């Protein structure tokens, strides 16, 4: 009987500790995912932007420029 009580208390304790730590680890994973997403957006190849007169079909124009549609369907970065 004593062994059964000890086992039940142990299982309850372990279950409670897992539930408590699961809440904290979920937040860390969420923040880690956000950090990784931001790193992927800011890697060197993603920061490349089109200068004036360059095409803007596959990459965005640099700040201060906008993509103007051309006659051939593609656009170029213009002020």
From Swiss-Prot:
Pfam families: Conotoxin. GO terms for molecular function: ion channel inhibitor activity; toxin activity. Keywords: Disulfide bond, Hydroxylation, Ion channel impairing toxin, Knottin, Secreted, Signal, Toxin. The keyword Disulfide bond applies. Its main location: secreted. The modification 4-hydroxyproline is found at residues 60, 63. Expressed by the venom duct. GO terms for cellular component: extracellular region. It is found in: Secreted. Residues 1-22 form the signal peptide. Residues 23-47 form a propeptide. Disulfide bonds join 49-62, 56-67, 61-77. The presence of a 'disulfide through disulfide knot' structurally defines this protein as a knottin. Ion channel inhibitor that inhibits the increase in intracellular calcium upon depolarization in DRG neurons. In vivo, both intraperitoneal and intracranial injections into mice induce hyperactivity. Belongs to the conotoxin O1 superfamily. This is Conotoxin Vi6.4. It comes from Conus virgo (Virgin cone). The lineage of its organism: Eukaryota, Metazoa, Spiralia, Lophotrochozoa, Mollusca.
């Amino acid at each position: 009987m004593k062994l059964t009580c000890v086992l039940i208390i142990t299982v309850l304790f372990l279950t409670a500790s897992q539930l408590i730590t699961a809440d904290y680890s979920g937040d860390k994973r969420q923040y880690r995912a956000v950090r990784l997403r931001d790193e992927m957006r800011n890697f060197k190849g993603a920061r490349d932007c089109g200068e004036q007169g360059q095409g803007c079909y596959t990459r965005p124009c640099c700040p201060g420029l906008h993509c103007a549609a051309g006659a051939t369907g593609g656009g170029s970065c213009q002020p």
